[in-house]
């Protein structure tokens, strides 16, 4: 039996905790997450359910809730539920008198996940060995508006630089993490955004980190999905051995047909007519570029190959 290495982690832009899950799946580490940071309500609830044991029964039977006014204030201070489309914060106060259990559920999920909320409102992070940083991709993804991630641009992807601010704070306090793992879409290293990525690497170097990056495709990592992502591992220079390497690509033969059921309940299907209508509505509303339109429609049986995700 392998003695697991203790690894403390801060998960920034934590989502549902897949960074943590990936580390745990290696079987090499005893992971302790000190804090998370996310503002998406569904992601926060999912994180707590997947990693912290949150259940409906727990929400109903938990006996140490503060007052509803205090819960609403706590979530508001953390900016939980902020809507980027309308640029408005969620009004938690409207749930105080209604008795709506969503207030209890989200507050408890935040507590269980040690969620600090909006990264732009965090003053400092607890010391950990590793920070994981899956910053928002909406402003650099080919499925988005390509607004960029330049520092000070106030795009969603530029929230990356708030993490750099927090890193400076930690360094000044003598609490620099040993490692930082960045992950984002392949377009991060495209001609359009490579200068910003290079600026990130230069900044990390100035702050005392050596950075190693690679574009990895899930289909060469044992997953039947054609999904390319940039991974960047930054290691503190005083502990870097120079031996960092990325895994060699491999194909274990697993295909999409091996993962899908042949008989699926009709309620899970959207027929082509409905899919076409949905795509038209999304394009008209400006939430789906025309270039993405062909992805949502079932045009052929591709189960023997790989699922494609941009």
Q: What residues fall within each predicted segment?
A:
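Short clusters of hydrophobic/aromatic residues that line enzyme substrate/ligand-binding pockets
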Residues: 140, 223, 246
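Conserved Class I SAM-dependent methyltransferase catalytic core
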Residues: 157-236
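S-adenosyl-L-methionine-dependent DNA methyltransferase catalytic core
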Residues: 1-33, 44, 79, 87, ...
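A broadly tuned preference for mixed-charge, low-complexity surface segments
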Residues: 60-66, 180-189, 281-297
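Core alpha/beta nucleotide-donor-binding catalytic domains of modification enzymes
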Residues: 2-177, 186-191, 195-197
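Short C-terminal domain-edge/linker segments immediately following a structured domain
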Residues: 42, 65-69, 161-166, 173, ...
